Amino acid sequence: MKKIFNFSAGPSMLPKQVLNQIQQELYDWNNLGISIMEISHRSLEFMELVHDTKRNLRNLLNIPNSYEILFCHGGARAQFSAIPMNFLRGSADNIDYINTGYWGYLAAIESKKYCHPNIINISSSKNELRYIKPMSEWNISKNSTYIHYCPNETVEGISIDDIPDCFEKKIVIADFSSTLLSRPVNVNNFGMIYAAAQKNMGISGLTVLIIRRSLINNISTVQKIPAILNYRILADSNSMFNTPVTVSWYIANLVFKWLQDQGGLDKIAEYNKKKSNLLYHAIDSNDFYYNNIHSLNRSRMNIPFFLKKEKLNSLFLSESTSFGLHGLKGHKVIGGMRASLYNAMTLEGVQKLVNFMNFFSKKYG
């Protein structure tokens, strides 16, 4: 079978070791004689899996006991609605939404159904390079109920790696869908972290929420929030208010164990840095390609790049696919190409992409 490398923004590659284990256990999970796809979510065996999954995630991120872990449906988009519904005290609340790019903006727009958010645009362009403005130019509200932001924008490939100083003593809610588990994160800096699983944690269908318990305790179970989106109800039911996506939970746990086997998030971060440095160097050292993000704000997970000869875009995509490189088409909003280097992408895969880019530029340059 031909070796394929999937650079899609999500669903992404899974580690080979995880795929092999899924294959081995597909018909007989945990020596029960039935598949994980068939087992009851109320069974003792599945409940053990739930506890193991939470424990492994808690260990990976050093999540303190003062935080609850929830496993939810609906992707990150469901949380765009759930967050204001759960945390707003009234429609007059001051809410800050940091507009870092495509996903940060969509979250802010969705919140308008429930409040009047202060949308803070923090990216700008100079000399054809997009960058994040200095924090002194961010118009943060003094008494905001919470601040929402997306630290890594998959579409534009722009990133805020460190938590901004201006967020200190604020309730910070962050969409970590494309970067959670790609590097260490100090959970204590956040009121809530949420992330869809299909990038660095497994397959689609699962969204992980890490929420400070004190925030959950302030939510009423009788508030006018759909029960399936009410964090208090989800916490009280151990994320099983309705039948969960059992397979997604199972695969997430396999990925958590794989990450531990790689040496944890410090080692993963080092490896991800090597991968992204390799690709950025290939782009910057070849006049055939370019990236439009300032070097200080470049994403390590999602790397857009453009051909200076745009008429060759379709040819690049077709030939790269034949080369075993899939999912390189850029997002429809910005075009060009995009290589997503999530945890399961190997250095071998990135090197193969670089080799193809060099080959293509020599052939058509």
Curated annotation (Swiss-Prot):
Pyridoxal 5'-phosphate binds at A76, R77, W103, T154, D175, Q198, N242, T243. It is found in: Cytoplasm. Keywords: Amino-acid biosynthesis, Aminotransferase, Cytoplasm, Pyridoxal phosphate, Pyridoxine biosynthesis, Serine biosynthesis, Transferase. It comes from the Bacteria. The modification N6-(pyridoxal phosphate)lysine is found at K199. GO terms for biological process: L-serine biosynthetic process; pyridoxine biosynthetic process. L-glutamate binds at R42. It catalyses: O-phospho-L-serine + 2-oxoglutarate = 3-phosphooxypyruvate + L-glutamate; 4-(phosphooxy)-L-threonine + 2-oxoglutarate = (R)-3-hydroxy-2-oxo-4-phosphooxybutanoate + L-glutamate. It is an enzyme of class 2 (transferase). PANTHER family: PHOSPHOSERINE AMINOTRANSFERASE. Belongs to the class-V pyridoxal-phosphate-dependent aminotransferase family. SerC subfamily. This is Phosphoserine aminotransferase. The gene is serC.
